[in-house]
């Protein structure tokens, strides 16, 4: 295929997201090759799948390419500690804590639950924090099942940009977050316990700053206001609950959430500002 045709193909949001994903898989796979060769082979398979999704013309590669960024995001998030180890990166919590004190005068993740020691508030905020997980998949999939391919492709690209930016920062300048450093005073309850159990099973140490939860939720909110405004209003509320709930529960520093929100705004705004070739 001529170079001009390839460039034209990658001007589409769908194919650009797949190219970005393939590039990330290539770099991170090389970093993991020496210590985790099987994982590196899985990355190579992911690159091949993304390439197939870009250049394949039948229904199967098109569908796989459409959904691939959504499917692999949780897996790549789980690899973050391995990348930190491969790079030998040190944690930067002391620096982030200085920013926290400069901005707030104290550590919100330590004091917010003591200011609002109400079990009902605690359960609401932890429920809001857990709403992040459906917020990853529901907005784009609603567009997909309705056949709104342009909105779907742009939404998935915004999500992919947010995730890749976060994963790179996590690997190079990891931050543990307050969950590993002190015990919060959030009131106990079933939703609180469920949240803690999910994080214990699936969170990645070093992936606190910027908050990928906040970056993705805010990016999804901005994209939803463009393509499905009623859902955008709901996601705006979810974004607030994710931001406050993460700090209230002692999972993130306040500046993690601010940085994540700004990142989400930037990537979603950039996607909406670009004039895309909707063929890809």
Protein language model regions, located:
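Hydrophobic, membrane-inserted alpha-helices
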Residues: 20-29, 46-52, 135-140, 164, ...
């Amino acid at each position: 295929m001529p170079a001009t045709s390839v460039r034209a193909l990658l001007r589409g949001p769908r194919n650009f997201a797949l190219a970005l994903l393939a590039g990330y898989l290539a770099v991170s796979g090389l970093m993991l090759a020496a210590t985790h060769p099987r994982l590196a082979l899985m990355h190579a398979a992911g690159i091949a799948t993304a390439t197939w999704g870009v250049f394949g013309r039948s229904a199967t590669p098109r569908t796989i390419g459409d959904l691939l960024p959504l499917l692999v995001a949780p897996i790549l998030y789980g690899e973050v500690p391995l990348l930190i180890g491969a790079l030998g990166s040190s944690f930067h919590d002391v620096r982030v804590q200085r920013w926290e004190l400069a901005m707030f005068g104290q550590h919100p993740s330590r004091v917010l639950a003591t200011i609002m020691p109400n079990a009902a508030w605690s359960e609401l905020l932890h429920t809001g924090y857990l709403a992040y997980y459906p917020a990853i998949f529901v907005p784009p999939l609603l567009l997909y099942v309705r056949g709104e391919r342009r909105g779907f492709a742009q939404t998935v690209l915004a999500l992919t940009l947010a995730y890749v930016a976060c994963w790179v920062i996590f690997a190079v300048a990891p931050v543990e977050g307050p969950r590993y450093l002190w015990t919060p005073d959030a009131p106990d309850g079933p939703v609180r316990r469920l949240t803690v159990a999910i994080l214990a099973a699936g969170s990645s140490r070093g992936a606190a700053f910027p908050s990928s939860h906040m970056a993705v939720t805010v990016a999804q909110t901005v994209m939803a206001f463009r393509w499905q405004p009623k859902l955008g209003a709901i996601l705006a509320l979810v974004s607030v609950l994710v931001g406050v709930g993460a700090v209230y529960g002692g999972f993130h520093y306040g500046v993690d959430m601010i940085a994540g929100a700004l990142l989400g705004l930037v990537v979603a705004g950039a996607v909406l500002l670009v004039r895309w070739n909707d063929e890809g």
